[in-house]
Design a protein with these regions (language model features):
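An accessory alpha-helical subdomain
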Residues: 196-217
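Structural signal for interior beta-strand "rungs" in well-ordered beta-sheet cores
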Residues: 1-186
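Conserved beta-strand-loop-alpha-helix hinge in the C-terminal portion
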Residues: 180-198
Length: 217
């Protein structure tokens, strides 16, 4: 722990946690084993963080929701294992109207300037590219990718393995495996590149593609 960092005596730190200069960890924060805060990281609120997460400079985790209905309720932010939070990433906890929890699962990458609002649920192996932003109550299923400078409207659900192209505005639910692009989202086809990268069996890809054609003509 760097001597310039301020760590609450009420915070819980696991084994081999590394905290660089000018970090702040407030009351009720729990950091599990092998996490690293490089520098200038602020973690606050009722925030529970799993193992081997890495936080880059100026990431701000657990500050109160940007929801005007929030009245200081004791909500939570839960983060799993092996996630990367790059510079200037912001994540807010839940609210009363959303079950009181924002949750991030495992092996996700949140690139520079991305934002996860209150009451979001993020699956595993999700990527938010630079400056992608999620409104409140958004659900992102496993292996989805949200392109840079995209905005996902509140209450939208993004299906597994879907890809959202850069600069997209997403206002409706997105089917699993779908590829969407545009200032307003429009269906362009299947995310075949993503399926192949994840080594999905070719016979399953054919089945998905045939189903897609039948439903969407």
């Amino acid at each position: 722990i760097h001597p310039t960092s301020l760590i609450s005596s009420k915070a819980v730190l696991g084994k081999n946690v590394k905290i660089g200069p000018f970090c702040i960890i407030d009351d009720n924060v729990s950091l599990n084993d092998d996490c690293e805060l490089i520098s200038n990281v602020h973690i606050t609120g009722n925030t529970i963080i799993g193992k081997n997460n890495k936080f880059f400079p100026y990431s701000t985790i657990g500050t109160i929701p940007q929801d005007l209905k929030f009245k200081g309720e004791d909500s939570k932010l839960i983060i799993g294992n092996n996630n990367s939070f790059r510079e200037h990433v912001t994540v807010n906890p839940g609210t009363f109207d959303g079950g009181m929890i924002t949750k991030i699962n495992d092996n996700c990458t949140f690139m520079v300037g991305s934002h996860i609002a209150h009451d979001c649920y993020i699956g595993s192996n999700v990527i938010l590219v630079n400056n992608a932003i999620l409104g409140g109550h958004v659900i992102i299923e496993d292996n989805a990718i949200i392109g840079g400078n995209s905005a996902v409207h509140q209450f939208v659900k993004i299906g597994k393995y879907a890809m959202i192209g850069g600069m997209s505005g997403v206002e409706t639910n997105i089917i699993p495996y779908g590829l969407y692009t545009g200032i307003r989202d429009s269906l362009r086809g299947l995310n075949l590149v993503g399926l192949k990268r994840k080594k999905v069996d070719s016979s399953n890809i054919i089945t998905i593609n045939n189903t897609f054609k039948k439903i969407f003509n």
